[in-house]
């Protein structure tokens, strides 16, 4: 294993922990500035990780639900740094109990979901509806449900599809490529490099085809494969 990549990983972990420890009290004492605190805090974090971001496409201001592929914490950092939209992230209940990061989720008033409790889906539906309709906060979900260990996307969980269809939402898919090279939590390495964020055309779910969700996973994986192939060809 490259020693420098391991050192960079621990540097990255320190930077993330430092910025998070600053954001936690700020979110608590200045709740009305929540969106700006998260936006600029993550923007500073991304800069200190020396990650260069290229974007393709544009975020849709109408989007109520963002569906993003998931490789690690850098996905969240990147989207928060790019979008000043007070995103409401859906995260499993266990993450709210993690030291530091759990406090960030709680003070950021994010949505927790208990996968082991059947009532968890009912709570999730209520929380999403309240977020979108009352707070006007778009919701962000990783449809895979957890981090992929490689560039192959995991099967999509049914929850995001159910939510989008129940509330007739406008969904914008987002593909993030390169986050694992910036911080690889599985291998505890960091090689730096470029991030590419691709905003796909929004999906008006009530007017979409019945297989829109399955097709979306296929389309997102195809984009990831194409980006990786282009990267290899440039080396």
What are these regions (language model features)?
Residues 16, 20, 24-28, 61-118:
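Catalytic core of membrane glycerolipid acyltransferases/transacylases, capturing the structured
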């Amino acid at each position: 294993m490259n020693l420098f990549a391991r050192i960079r990983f621990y540097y990255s972990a320190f930077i993330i922990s430092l910025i998070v420890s600053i954001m936690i009290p700020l979110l608590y004492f200045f709740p009305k500035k929540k969106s700006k605190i998260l936006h600029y805090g993550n923007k500073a974090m991304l800069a200190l990780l020396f990650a260069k971001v290229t974007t393709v496409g544009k975020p849709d201001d109408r989007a109520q639900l963002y569906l993003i592929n998931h490789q690690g914490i850098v996905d969240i950092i990147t989207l928060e740094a790019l979008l000043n939209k007070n995103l409401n992230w859906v995260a499993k209940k266990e993450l709210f109990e993690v030291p530091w990061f759990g406090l960030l989720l709680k003070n950021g008033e994010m949505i927790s979901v208990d996968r082991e409790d059947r009532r968890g889906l009912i709570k999730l539906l209520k929380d999403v509806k309240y977020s979108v309709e009352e707070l006007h906060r778009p919701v962000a979900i990783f449809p895979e449900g957890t981090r992929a260990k490689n560039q192959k996307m995991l099967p999509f969980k049914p929850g995001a599809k159910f939510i989008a269809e129940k509330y007739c939402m406008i969904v914008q898919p987002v593909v993030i490529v390169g986050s694992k090279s910036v911080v690889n939590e599985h291998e505890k390495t960091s090689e730096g490099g470029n991030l590419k964020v691709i905003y796909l055309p929004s999906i008006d779910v009530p007017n979409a085809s019945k297989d829109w969700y399955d097709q979306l996973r296929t389309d997102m994986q195809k984009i990831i494969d194409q980006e990786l192939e282009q990267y290899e060809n440039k080396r």
